[in-house]
Amino acid sequence: MPRAAVVCGLGSYLPEAVLSNDMLAAELDTSDAWISSRTGVRQRHIAGDLGSGDLALRAASAALASAGLERVDAVVLATSTGDFCCPATAPRVAARLGLVGALAFDLSAACTGFVYGLASVGSLISAGLADSALLVGVDTFSHTLDPADRSTRALFGDGAGAVVLRAGDAEEEGALLAFDLGSDGHQFDLLMTPAVSRAERSSGQASNYFRMDGKAVFGQAVTQMSDSVRRVLDRVGWQASDLHHLVPHQANTRILAAVADQLDLPVERVVSNIAEVGNTVAASIPLALAHGLRQGILRDGGNMVLTGFGAGLTWGSVALRWPKIVPTMD
């Protein structure tokens, strides 16, 4: 039987500093009612002086503890806000974990990064290049935002979520069963951060800040995630009605509701934690998984699809049966 990548550990980390809607309203022309009605976000965590590598280290340590492992063969970071333009952040995180010699690299696919990362790690394991691997979705997007832009500051937060995967077979719970991945670079400018380094992003120059076309992004996000979920369901032989859990990128509550409606899926099957953490970019899916486990929402052995959409434009989905996991949070 061909080797498969099997999820066996989960960890998460959120910075201690919390920025509530009321706190944001004290700085900008906005209100809790305005923010929550448009995005569903009530608070977000802010990294401050911490970098993405710092957050990734904490989530990775928690995931390794959850899996009962001290070492893995590969470390992959899905991030758009690495500590440097060059070198990649993953090798430094691996070294801080005591994993010198491990294969390590960064992957940049914005809010789809965690799904792309699962495909990359799954391929490494399936090819026999690794028997175990750590994937961290992490972003410190607050470092990219214009302090005067209420639309982006209201939406985005910082955080990290990580999973450990090991070699196994496709019959096991937690095995990655099927993927759908895609992109459309013609629309690259709908979401973008022109700056390439943290220093540039923190320079105070408006041209370096993250920007997005919210109205255009809404339509693309709903269409691409819905279509991607349908394709991956077809590849694994499931119907939408067979799904126990849909775990989408936490873009905003309106997008999540629209995707559920497109799939004719009861909204209670959609896992969401956006109210507590905001849009955490590549960290959003693993943070939503950790939330679902802690809340007792996720069903062991339940049919699950993870789906993402982000800058690029990129999108992707993966199907699996959720394994029994003890989550840990640093």
From Swiss-Prot:
Active site: C111, H249, N279
GO MF annotation list: 3-oxoacyl-[acyl-carrier-protein] synthase activity; beta-ketoacyl-acyl-carrier-protein synthase III activity
InterPro entries named in the record: ACP_syn_III_C (IPR013747), ACP_syn_III_N (IPR013751), FabH (IPR004655), Thiolase-like (IPR016039)
Gene3D superfamilies membership: 3.40.47.10
Classification via SUPFAM superfamilies: Thiolase-like (SSF53901)
Enzyme class, spelled out: transferase
Region (ACP-binding) location: 250-254
Recorded GO CC terms: cytoplasm
Keywords noted in UniProt: Acyltransferase, Cytoplasm, Fatty acid biosynthesis, Fatty acid metabolism, Lipid biosynthesis, Lipid metabolism, Multifunctional enzyme, Transferase
Listed pathway(s): Lipid metabolism; fatty acid biosynthesis
Family membership: Belongs to the thiolase-like superfamily. FabH family.
Domain notes: The last Arg residue of the ACP-binding site is essential for the weak association between ACP/AcpP and FabH.
Subunit architecture: Homodimer.
Function: Catalyzes the condensation reaction of fatty acid synthesis by the addition to an acyl acceptor of two carbons from malonyl-ACP. Catalyzes the first condensation reaction which initiates fatty acid synthesis and may therefore play a role in governing the total rate of fatty acid production. Possesses both acetoacetyl-ACP synthase and acetyl transacylase activities. Its substrate specificity determines the biosynthesis of branched-chain and/or straight-chain of fatty acids.
Protein name per UniProt: Beta-ketoacyl-[acyl-carrier-protein] synthase III
